[in-house]
């Protein structure tokens, strides 16, 4: 989604609601900058934002109308003239790689074996008494 510039008309009459509007818009993901003109009540939001979501959230605070939405074009970069590369220094003669001997880790004298994790109880033995009586009383 390209960066957008949205101009919103808000009807704000109190400082408290103005602050809530700023906080609500600033919490939306992708907002780059927020400006507001107190005389006209227009708020300008710039960034990669979902404009209808911002309008829905602001309508819970005050009367909000969407004035315009524009795609912000990135500033054009002027091509810089190429500078001549400085001459490369002569390569240094190859040195043999240093061998570093790391100390061998010995057992810590205060290292204890971990305790067994007996955090459960053994279940009681369940048994069923099944009687296999094949004699029939009715017949």
Swiss-Prot record:
Induction: Up-regulated by cadmium. One of its GO terms (molecular function) is metal ion binding. Residues 3-70 form the HMA domain. Keywords: Lipoprotein, Metal-binding, Methylation, Prenylation. It comes from the Eukaryota. The modification Cysteine methyl ester is found at residue 136. The keyword Lipoprotein applies. Signal peptide: none annotated. InterPro entries: HIPP (IPR051863), HMA_dom (IPR006121). Residues 73-85 have a biased composition (Basic and acidic residues). Belongs to the HIPP family. Probable heavy-metal-binding protein. This is Heavy metal-associated isoprenylated plant protein 13. It comes from Arabidopsis thaliana. The lineage of its organism: Eukaryota, Viridiplantae, Streptophyta, Embryophyta, Tracheophyta.
């Amino acid at each position: 989604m390209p960066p957008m510039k949205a101009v919103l008309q808000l009807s704000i009459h109190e400082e408290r609601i103005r602050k809530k509007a700023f906080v609500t818009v600033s919490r939306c993901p992708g907002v780059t900058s927020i400006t507001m003109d107190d005389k006209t009540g227009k708020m300008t939001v710039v960034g990669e934002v979902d404009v209808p979501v911002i309008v829905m959230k602001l309508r819970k605070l005050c009367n909000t109308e969407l004035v315009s939405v524009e795609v912000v074009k990135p500033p054009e970069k002027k091509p810089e003239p190429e500078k001549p590369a400085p001459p490369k220094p002569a390569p240094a003669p190859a040195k043999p790689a240093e061998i570093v001997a790391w100390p061998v880790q010995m057992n810590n004298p205060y290292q204890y074996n971990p305790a067994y994790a007996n955090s459960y109880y053994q279940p009681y033995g369940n048994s069923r008494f099944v009687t296999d009586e094949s004699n029939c009383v009715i017949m």
